[in-house]
From Swiss-Prot:
UniProt-recorded name of the protein: Envelope protein OPG155
Signal sequence segment: none
Keyword tRNA-binding found: no
Native species: Ectromelia virus (strain Moscow)
PTM per Swiss-Prot/TrEMBL: Contains two intramolecular disulfide bonds. They are created by the viral disulfide bond formation pathway, a poxvirus-specific pathway that operates on the cytoplasmic side of the MV membranes.
Localization per Swiss-Prot or TrEMBL: Virion membrane
Membrane topology, Virion surface segments: 22-146
Gene that specifies this protein: OPG155
Quaternary assembly: Part of a stable entry-fusion complex (EFC) which is at least composed of proteins OPG143, OPG147, OPG155, OPG086, OPG094, OPG107, OPG104, and OPG099. Formation of the viral membrane is necessary for the assembly of the complex. Interacts directly with protein OPG107.
Annotated GO biological process: membrane fusion involved in viral entry into host cell; symbiont entry into host cell
Length: 146
């Protein structure tokens, strides 16, 4: 055996030993690892180091399957009238008498969040930026918050 073969055998042996040491370390600290993961589960929703967003699979909401930031629903302050739920699709609306639509407004941010991310399946959406109302104040506001 030449010196190059001995070098590779030593490196391979060291690598295998490190794997065994890591495996034993995980085995010894498995309880602590589970406790750590349970404590820090709230950080599941943060971005990972690789840049891909991690999804919080414990709670399903409307933004889980959307990757475009402008399409995600958010609660924003509406000028003088509380909070509204908005995305590039428009505003969430209330349907009144004679099928009239008005933007659904909330008194507090928490009410807006609770409604926007609840399990409501049928949501009416009003997009003020669809012709013929492209230059109205509601459309300008929607563009400004996206």
């Amino acid at each position: 055996m030449n010196s190059l073969s001995i070098f590779f055998i030593v490196v391979a042996t060291a690598a295998v030993c490190l794997l065994f040491i890591q495996g034993y370390s995980i085995y010894e600290n498995y309880g602590n690892i589970k406790e750590f993961n349970a404590t820090h589960a709230a950080f599941e929703y943060s971005k990972s180091i690789g840049g891909t967003p991690a999804l919080d699979r414990r709670v399903q909401d409307v933004n889980d399957t959307i990757s475009d930031v402008k399409q995600k629903w958010r609660c924003v302050v509406y000028p003088g009238n509380g909070f509204v739920s908005a995305s590039i699709f428009g505003f969430q609306t209330e349907v009144g008498l004679n099928n009239t639509r008005s933007i659904r407004k909330f008194n507090t941010m928490q009410q807006c969040i609770d409604f926007t991310f609840s399990d409501v399946i049928n949501i009416d959406i009003y997009n003020p930026c669809v012709a013929p109302n492209i230059n109205n104040a509601e459309c300008q506001f929607l563009k400004s918050v996206l």
